[in-house]
Amino acid sequence: MAVVTMRQLLESGVHFGHQTRRWNPKMKRFIFTERNGIYIIDLRQTLDYIEKAYDFVRGTVAEGGSILFVGTKKQAQEAIAEQATRVGQPYVNHRWLGGMLTNFQTVYKRLQRMKELEALGDLSGTAAGYTKKETLQLSREKEKLSRTLGGLRDMQKLPAAIWVVDTKKEHIAVDEARKLGIPVIAVLDTNCDPDEVDYPIPGNDDAIRSAELLTKVVAAAVADGLIARSGRRRGTDEKPEAGVASDEPLAEWERELLEEPKKSDEPKSDEQPAAAAAE
């Protein structure tokens, strides 16, 4: 059974790219066609790349590695925190602090400080041995650390790979991972650079449902890897579905994505970015 179905991708809007005037020419090979000034991503390729990313994540986790989930844009924050927590992986869903990977020793010290403050208990009143002013300062420090580093509290070492929603927004995280040789798995919208990613998944990185579905797929791969790591057998080679598809009818042009591509629908090699109406 497939990790995720074509219908699920369509219903989550994974196929919608950016306006044709906002694109990266390197993404041409992932584009199926253009509709009303919007690029449509080839979901056949998306399915293939999802399989590759799934197998990589599963294998990495099965061998003892961890996956750092990264997505600080509003559309991805909830899914990143929810899915990473569900499978016990670290995550960053607020501002990425420079050096979170390349200067992890310092980050680790801050994590220990956060745990020390948490051990003090409730800081809403006056903590034992501290003045009211000191207690207020400690409370603010604890809140700040929890907001920025809370998702990393159990991370003891660098992750084996990172999962990213929106490589343009999270370019610092991607750059740090590349410097350290940490594989990057990411959603690639039509304005992204595929050369920056080791395991790309062509898709919409702006829609909430798209970010949620793809993050759920990565989390499912992590869960599968944890099962393999523990030595338990699933009893089947089938991969878990990321969700349940409905039976709502698809639009005619969406059905084209389920059929063989027509040559006329493929992006032309000399195609130039066309002007489109503002979003």
UniProtKB/Swiss-Prot annotation:
This is Small ribosomal subunit protein uS2. Belongs to the universal ribosomal protein uS2 family. One of its GO terms (molecular function) is structural constituent of ribosome. It comes from Salinispora arenicola (strain CNS-205). Coiled coil: none annotated. Residues 232-279 are annotated as: Disordered. GO terms for cellular component: cytosolic small ribosomal subunit. Keywords: Ribonucleoprotein, Ribosomal protein. Residues 252-271 have a biased composition (Basic and acidic residues). HAMAP family: Ribosomal_uS2_B. GO terms for biological process: translation.
